[in-house]
Design a protein with these regions (language model features):
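Short alpha-helical transmembrane segments in multi-pass integral membrane proteins
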Residues: 1-14, 71-138, 184-240, 296-361, ...
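Transmembrane helical elements of multi-pass membrane transporters/channels
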Residues: 11-31, 132, 166, 199-203, ...
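Transmembrane alpha-helix boundary and packing residues in multipass membrane permease domains
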Residues: 17, 21, 33, 69, ...
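Small-residue-rich hydrophobic transmembrane alpha-helices
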Residues: 43-103, 140-154, 158-159, 257, ...
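Hydrophobic transmembrane alpha-helices of multi-pass small-molecule transporters
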Residues: 55-58, 102, 170-175, 204-208, ...
Length: 438
């Protein structure tokens, strides 16, 4: 990872990620399409549950980023023992996180939903969906920990295979469990949740199968479970800021749902649909950033600073190109995109306006996402968190609150692109300063 030409290396690491994340985003959209066929109320229930579900995923992925960064850095420095200790501690802590998330998420969900709606049918649907999803939280945590471990050692094709297998099975199970088939009864929104959990379980099975039959540079070992407070501190030092980076959108969605609900429930539905579409539009770029992250960590550990700089520049260019394509899709295909999720003319009209405004910030957002990912790879979790705080808290919340008073609900949509422009002005100097200290 420190000798191969940078561009082919980045492409070889990123391409499996891009493919797997495209499949994952396709699953998210297909899953929502099936739920939307149940009713618009079912889609609203998913939109309301989304912030807590996203927060749980943020813990899994964010802590996994810490595992990934530490393994890659220790391997780059030639310290296999430390890399294995980081992997083992990371897996054990991930399992603990999963148990806690299951208990806490199920406990708080009824009260959380009642903050946004008094409709008992919506609340019941949200509780049904979330309870089943969070019962699989520990399985999801273990799967994502394995994903980051395989990525750290350059086995991107394994993570691609595991994710695609789980997502395809999920997509196939959705119509069967939601609407019923033969002896399988129609389960409605509960079927969508169960299909998601089974898909996560099957992805984990792929990782376990490959791990048991393949020689890897890093193994999970009982001998590495001995307490190591210094290592755990470093894992959380990278993982906690990464978790906050990923969890901040949940806080943002909760805040924006509160603003938009004051106009009509259709705006809440549109925001939920946008975030489903956002996974499809952003995940290819995020796949490139994921491919960059272990490479930057490895080369930083090996003191190859010129390669670190080149990796950042190439990732930025590739991400911006992908987001330019996303902008064109939203500008010229906003109507058919919305029609995938709803037949309500009012919701479609609101969604068209929202997509055409929000997408104005897509290209410039590449600066923030690339800088944040590079900083995580360098182990600069705090600096990465600064960028995310700007994107999801410090800029957009005040802007949305102020602009909606002058522009109505459209003010919320305008807050998105203005925030991306302001965040880019912060992100690049923060990255340059951090690299200067390396």
């Amino acid at each position: 990872m420190k000798e191969k030409p940078v561009l082919p290396l980045l492409v070889s690491m990123a391409l499996p990620n891009v493919i797997s994340m495209l499949v994952n985003s396709l699953y998210n959209i297909v899953d929502s399409l099936f739920v939307a066929r149940i009713s618009e109320d079912a889609m609203t229930a998913l939109s309301l549950v989304f912030p807590i579900q996203n927060f749980a995923n943020a813990i899994a992925i964010g802590f996994g980023i810490g595992i990934n960064a530490m393994i890659a850095r220790y391997l780059g420095a030639g310290d296999r023992k430390k890399a294995e200790t980081a992997a083992t501690h990371g897996m054990a802590l991930s399992l603990m996180h999963g148990i806690l998330i299951t208990i806490l998420s199920i406990a708080i969900m009824p009260g959380f939903l009642r903050r946004f709606t008094g409709d008992e049918s919506l609340i019941s649907s949200g509780i049904t969906y979330s309870t089943i999803v969070f019962l699989f939280a520990t399985i999801n945590m273990a799967g994502l920990a394995f994903e980051k471990m395989f990525q750290a050692v350059g086995r991107m094709k394994v993570t691609m295979a595991a994710l695609i297998f789980g997502c395809v099975c999920n997509i196939l199970l959705d119509p069967v469990l939601i609407f019923g088939l033969g002896p399988v009864p129609a389960m409605g929104i509960a079927g969508a949740a169960l299909a998601t959990g089974i898909g996560q379980l099957l992805s984990l099975c792929v990782y376990l199968f490959v791990y048991a039959r393949t020689e890897l540079p890093v193994r999970l070992r009982r001998s590495c479970l001995r307490p190591d407070a210094a290592l755990d501190k470093r894992l959380y030092g990278i993982g906690v800021p990464a978790i906050l980076n990923l969890a901040l959108p949940s806080l943002l969605v909760t805040f924006l749902n509160g603003l938009l609900a004051g106009f009509s429930q259709s705006y809440v539905v549109v925001l939920g649909i946008y975030y489903k579409l956002q996974t499809f539009l952003y995940l290819p770029a995020n796949g490139i950033v994921q491919g960059m992250r272990p490479l930057i960590g490895y080369n930083y550990g090996a003191r190859q600073h010129a390669r670190v700089k080149k990796l950042y520049e190439l990732t930025l260019i590739m991400s911006a190109a992908i987001m330019a394509a996303g902008t064109l899709i939203c500008l010229f295909a906003s109507c058919p995109l919305m029609q995938l999720f709803t037949s309500n003319p009012e919701t479609i009209a609101i969604g068209q306006t929202a997509l055409r405004i929000i997408c104005l910030g897509f290209v410039v957002s590449a600066v923030s996402t690339t800088s944040s990912g590079a900083l995580e790879g360098l182990g600069k979790g705090t600096e990465s968190l600064i960028i995310s705080l700007c994107r999801y808290l410090l800029f957009i919340m005040p802007l949305a609150a102020v602009l909606c008073h002058f522009l109505g609900a459209n003010g919320v949509w305008h807050a998105f692109w203005i925030t991306e422009a302001l965040s880019a002005l912060v992100a690049y100097p923060v990255y340059r300063r951090a690299v200067g200290k390396c």
